[in-house]
Design a protein with these regions (language model features):
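Short, low-complexity, intrinsically disordered N-terminal peptides in bacterial proteins
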Residues: 1-9
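Structural signal for interior beta-strand "rungs" in well-ordered beta-sheet cores
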Residues: 9-154
């Protein structure tokens, strides 16, 4: 990875679109793919093989582990290609192979709050709202429009 303090540390095999907005302290691992509408905040670490696509805003100090996919089209028959997004807050841990879909509905968002610990192979579907300080265990799946309030354990 490059060592320039003025630019994110991006592994040479990662594909980062030139329009993506990454804070200078972001680290991007091998073979990650980051699309043009992605914004990543200060101190976030993106692991290998991560895909961030579509309109995605990720806050500060998140740890995004290998194989995570954020911002893919929703798995919803009502989705017609309308612009929607994923918003991830600060200080979250997303373990291996977590998948978070964009929302259905123009301007709608799938939201993940702050300080959540989402274990491996968790699916967060379209239009979900996750508060803060939540733990979701390995292999859990949240269907579309699920709301999880602060402090929940699933």
């Amino acid at each position: 990875m490059s060592e320039d303090a003025q630019h994110p540390r991006i592994h040479p095999t990662a594909l980062v679109h030139p329009q993506a907005r990454l804070h200078p302290t972001v680290q991007v691992g091998p073979y990650a793919v980051i699309g043009p509408q992605v914004e990543v905040g200060e101190g976030t670490v993106i692991g290998p093989y991560v895909v961030l696509d579509g309109q995605v805003r990720i806050g500060r100090r998140n740890r995004i582990h290998a194989g995570v996919v954020i911002g893919c089209e929703p798995q919803d028959r009502n989705f017609r290609g309308e612009p929607s997004s994923v918003v991830v807050g600060d200080d979250n841990v997303l373990r291996e192979y977590v998948q978070i879909s964009r929302a259905t509905g123009e301007g709608a968002a799938t939201v993940v709050g702050d300080r959540n610990y989402i274990m491996s192979m968790v699916h967060v579907a379209h239009n979900c709202y996750l508060g803060s300080d939540i733990v979701i265990v390995t292999g859990s799946g949240l269907a579309g429009y699920v709301r999880v309030d602060d402090g929940a354990q699933i």
